[in-house]
């Protein structure tokens, strides 16, 4: 059940080689370019160089699923076969963009594949697949509990041959990035509809549209996640053509449900890679540092921590692969239980793993000298992103209880 296809295994070997030759040796250079940049949200020259090399190596758009094989050169991958590749990429927080496999663009590209018109695909999907532009998904709002997607208040009103948007969004990933050109915006177009799930629509808004105001970059645990950033945005009388609606009026919630499930899985895949690398670094540290006359690796408490980390990573990986297998064989709608279990379990486990590995590194584990502090921030962020743990646990608990209610 858990043996990956030969195509996936071959890609994993090539991807690991690329990481060894191009990514790990450039981690310090990337950090230096980012710190030296006059504009932290501008594209970095090193990133563009690495993207060209990844394209030439045939390691591009690896996220594209089998059913959309026409959009990639590798023939598409199942969730199960993509998992080990995303795990490898997750070992360096910024490197998924090198392979055009970064959030939220992967999810947004799948939205365009599944729900956009041919004209919308030509205008936005094609340059996204080429890596020429980036995108944002504007859903979360500061004034309401956006974990309930039906709460969104941004208004979408029809005025002649245009949609007019007014509202307030925040934590919109990618929106600060200069290369981001298109926002997928969710809001209420029919607030009086008796069905709460038919009140929303999703509208395509070019970022340079008059009335789109980037208020500020937001931080998570002090990280601004440059150069992509998480923005607070105000939409003030933003006007776009009627053709900029996705799928149709009242279909916004449907699109959100179709988009967010796979995105949650991708985050968990990458997090396992971050946890695995943290464990490896902790083991190297334990074998090289001495306290009280003994290597750290000789201390019982360190061995216990390493044991817990190993076990929790294995648990997380197996849970993820079972969820991937169910998605591949039964589809996303039938797999919401496993997606919820994965989404609520893996970020929490990874956060614990990285915390122990940081502790083994002493004060250095808290610094930018190692990847763990940023990875910890990513894991903690994932417990809120795409819906907080509690919402998914509530829905999953109800689903499990209902199975045994009759």
Annotated model-derived regions:
Residues 73, 146, 214, 244-249:
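Cytochrome P450 core scaffold surrounding the K-helix E-X-X-R motif
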Residues 77, 147-150, 175-180, 195-198, ...:
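Short glycine/proline-enriched turns and hinge-like loops at secondary-structure junctions
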Residues 102-109:
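Short, conserved phosphate-binding/catalytic loop or strand-edge motifs used
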Residues 109-115, 192:
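Flexible, glycine-rich active-site loops centered on histidine and acidic residues
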Residues 161-162, 166-215:
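A short core secondary-structure module
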């Amino acid at each position: 059940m858990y043996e990956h296809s030969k195509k996936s295994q071959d890609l994993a070997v090539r991807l690991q080689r690329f990481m060894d030759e191009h990514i790990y040796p450039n981690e310090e250079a990337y950090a230096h370019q980012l710190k030296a940049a006059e504009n932290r949200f501008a594209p970095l020259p090193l990133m563009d160089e690495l993207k060209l090399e990844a394209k030439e190596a045939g390691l591009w758009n690896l996220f594209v699923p089998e059913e959309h094989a026409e959009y990639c050169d590798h023939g598409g991958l199942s969730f199960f076969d993509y998992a080990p590749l995303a795990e490898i990429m997750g070992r360096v927080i910024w490197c998924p963009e090198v392979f055009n496999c970064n959030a939220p663009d992967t999810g947004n590209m799948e939205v365009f594949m599944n729900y956009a018109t041919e004209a919308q695909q030509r205008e936005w999907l094609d340059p996204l697949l080429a890596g020429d532009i980036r995108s944002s998904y504007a859903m979360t709002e500061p004034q309401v509990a956006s974990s309930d997607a039906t709460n969104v208040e941004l208004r979408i009103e029809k005025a002649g041959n245009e949609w007019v948007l007014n509202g307030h969004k925040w934590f919109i990933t990618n929106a600060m990035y200069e290369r981001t050109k298109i926002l997928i915006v969710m809001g209420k177009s029919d607030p009086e509809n008796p069905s709460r799930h038919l009140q929303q629509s999703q509208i395509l808004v070019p970022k340079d549209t008059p009335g789109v105001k980037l208020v500020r970059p937001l931080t998570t645990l002090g990280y601004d996640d440059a150069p992509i950033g998480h923005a607070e945005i105000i939409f003030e009388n933003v006007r776009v053509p009627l053709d900029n609606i996705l799928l149709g009026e009242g279909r916004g919630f449907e699109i959100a449900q179709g988009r967010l499930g796979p995105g949650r899985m991708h985050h968990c895949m990458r997090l396992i890679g971050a946890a695995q690398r943290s464990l490896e670094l902790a083991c190297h540290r334990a074998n090289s540092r001495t306290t009280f006359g003994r290597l750290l690796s000789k201390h019982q408490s360190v061995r216990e921590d390493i044991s817990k980390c190993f076990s929790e990573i294995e648990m997380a990986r197996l849970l993820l692969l079972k969820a991937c297998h169910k998605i591949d064989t039964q589809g996303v709608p039938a797999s919401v239980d496993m997606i919820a279990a994965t989404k609520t379990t893996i970020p929490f486990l990874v956060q614990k793993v990285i915390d122990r590995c940081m502790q083994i590194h002493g004060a250095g584990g808290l610094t930018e000298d190692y990847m763990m502090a940023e990875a910890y921030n990513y894991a903690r962020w994932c417990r809120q992103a795409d819906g907080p743990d509690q919402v998914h646990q509530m829905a999953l608990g109800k689903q499990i209880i209902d199975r045994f209610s009759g």
